[in-house]
Amino acid sequence: MIYCPGRSLLHLPTWADRRRCFERVAASLRSNGRFAWNAFAFDHHVASAIDGQHADTPLPHTNYYSVSDNRVDITLDDGGTGSLWWATKNEWLGLLDVAGLRLEALYGGFDGEPLDDDSREYIFVARR
């Protein structure tokens, strides 16, 4: 099993970066091996409510959303910055397809909740 926790795949900014990652994962898995990762499910209601708004947890920061780039920029009060690039469910499924992996399960939360319109998280499990 290869597991990418903590939304780590969202640090890859382009389709090409993600495709290479998925292809390398597929090449590294044994036959029938599993690949699991999580990513937030973009919600425009949440984004519009917190865009540009200061928050204190987990660290003092402000998020700025760029919908045209599928990107959220995080600026810490101490000056640090970072970005995450979200993807849709179908973009993730397309990456599985081009890498020759097949979807085993897709959940809407870490407790195995079904994915629905209220889900805030994608939990993917794929097989080679």
Residues covered by each model-derived region:
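C-terminal lobe and adjacent flexible extensions of AdoMet/dcAdoMet transferase-like proteins
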Residues: K89-R128
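Short beta-strands and strand-loop turn motifs
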Residues: Y3-G6, N38, Y107
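Accessory recognition modules or surfaces
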Residues: M1, H61-L76, D111-R127
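Short, hinge-like loop/turn segments at secondary-structure boundaries
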Residues: I2-Y3, G52-D56, Y122-I123
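A short SAM/SAH-binding and catalytic strip from SAM-dependent methyltransferases
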Residues: M1-A16
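A short glycine-rich, Lys/Arg-flanked "PGG" loop and its adjoining helix->strand segment in the class I
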Residues: D17-R34
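SAM-dependent methyltransferase
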Residues: T14, A36-V98
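Short conserved AdoMet
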Residues: P13, R30, R128
